[in-house]
A protein has these predicted regions:
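Alpha-solenoid helical repeat scaffolds
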Residues: 42-47, 80-82
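N-terminal alpha-helical interaction modules that lie
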Residues: 1-29, 33-36, 59-107
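TPR repeat positional signature
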Residues: 8, 46-49
Length: 107
């Protein structure tokens, strides 16, 4: 899982450098699914989503990440909605389908 997570983060960074926000958020969402049970990584992805939202000028996304950052610190090890993308426009309590190519990596 570490390799898959790292690849998603690198791919998100590359897309952000090109200002390709759709691709960047897709990779951040996939990294989020992989990191949900790991407090540090989970929090890092929400931080990156906040920064990406600011860079894009999407203040709803950026502001929506603030409570998710707090929740990731407090609840990552207790409960997370499996497959949730982590985006501000999705309920933080909604379980979502895990992408098929990640299913074998997500507990």
């Amino acid at each position: 899982m570490d390799e898959a997570y790292e690849q998603e983060v690198v791919s998100a960074d590359e897309a952000l450098q090109r200002d390709d926000f759709e691709v960047a958020f897709r990779h951040l969402e996939r990294a989020h699914v992989l990191a949900q049970r790991m407090t540090g990584r989970h929090t890092f992805i929400h931080w990156r989503m906040l920064l990406a939202g600011l860079h894009r000028g999407d203040f709803r996304e950026a502001v929506g990440q603030v409570p998710r950052i707090v929740a990731s610190i407090l609840f990552s090890r207790l409960w997370v909605p499996r497959g949730n993308s982590g985006r501000a426009r999705v309920s933080a309590f909604k379980s979502m389908p895990v992408p098929a190519d990640l299913r074998h990596l997500v507990p």
